Amino acid sequence: MSRVAKCPIVIPSGVNVQLDLQDISIKGKYGHLSRTIHQSVKIEFLNNQIIFSPRLGFSNGWAQAGTSRALVNSMIIGVSEKFSKKLQLSGVGYRVSITKDNIINMSLGYSHIITYHLPKGINAENLSPTEIIIQGIDKQLVGQIAANLRSYRTPEPYKGKGIRYSNEVVRIKEAKKK
């Protein structure tokens, strides 16, 4: 059994936390996030720490408390530091560019250019024609957008062409021999 919920979250300086029953809102240097916590979780705010514990009468209380603690911890990290995912394009003619109004244009070997509109709160930075960084305060949204962009051309196992995460290792298969 995981014991994530038993460890309290220490709130760093510059982060403001407000509790209202099951609603928690966090303000930091980079923005504001809010979330409703599951009803089986009791939240306490003591000595600049947030403590999660299960309420009586719920069978999944500890599981929900651990999940809630992890979600709130990622919210605190997001508003104070930001999350980022780096994507690399590998393949002949594969290019990426970003317009001023947060639209990503990708040339991925299709007959047309793929355009992707970034939602509010997410920024993209073009390091080179084949590298892009997705940044934002919401960890789930940053990861989902990076996965959506990667899904347009996932790395194939024979030559490794496609869009990959910067830390991803694509295992190359050997070609069929006669």
Swiss-Prot record:
GO terms for cellular component: cytosolic large ribosomal subunit. Keywords: Ribonucleoprotein, Ribosomal protein, RNA-binding, rRNA-binding. The keyword Ribosomal protein applies. GO terms for biological process: cytoplasmic translation. SUPFAM superfamilies: Ribosomal protein L6. The keyword RNA-binding applies. GO terms for molecular function: rRNA binding; structural constituent of ribosome. HAMAP family: Ribosomal_uL6_B. Belongs to the universal ribosomal protein uL6 family. Part of the 50S ribosomal subunit. This protein binds to the 23S rRNA, and is important in its secondary structure. It is located near the subunit interface in the base of the L7/L12 stalk, and near the tRNA binding site of the peptidyltransferase center. This is Large ribosomal subunit protein uL6. The lineage of its organism: Bacteria, Pseudomonadati, Pseudomonadota, Gammaproteobacteria, Enterobacterales. The gene is rplF.
